[in-house]
Design a protein with these regions (language model features):
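Short alpha-helical segments enriched in small residues
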Residues: 1-129
């Protein structure tokens, strides 16, 4: 059983729905879930918010957060996750933003850096890889 299958199984068991707000992954997270049988029981919504304007409009990321921390930050990823969860009444959500490359990286935010925001049952947390 792959990770997507494990996630769908767990979400079904808990009777949770999931939504995604993706940037650098371009919808690949949701696509993995859709490939799993019974995904329709758990996948609520998925949006690709590549541009900052889309992050603000569809994932409720504040302009101030983008200005202060940038599109690739844990703050932005958290707001993406919370925004897409609340907009779609999801129990669980993920916000993903990063530097896909091959250019665009900096010393502080190198190519390959990805920030993850998670919303689970009203709690929000994040991580960077």
């Amino acid at each position: 059983m792959n990770k997507a299958e494990q996630l769908v199984k767990l979400l079904i068991e808990k009777k949770y729905t999931v939504s995604f707000a993706e940037s650098c992954t371009g919808g690949k997270m949701a696509a993995r879930i859709v490939d799993v049988p019974d995904a329709s029981k758990v996948l609520n919504a998925s949006i690709v918010t590549y541009a900052n304007e889309a992050k603000m409009k569809y994932a409720n990321v504040s302009k101030d957060t983008l200005k202060q921390y940038g599109a690739v930050s844990e703050n932005t990823a958290r707001e993406m996750a919370e925004g897409v969860a609340k907009a779609n009444n999801a129990d669980v959500a993920a916000g993903i933003s990063g530097i896909a490359g091959p250019t665009g990286g900096t010393e502080d935010k190198p190519v390959g850096m990805v920030c993850f925001g998670f919303y689970i049952d009203g709690k929000v947390f994040s991580d960077t890889k």
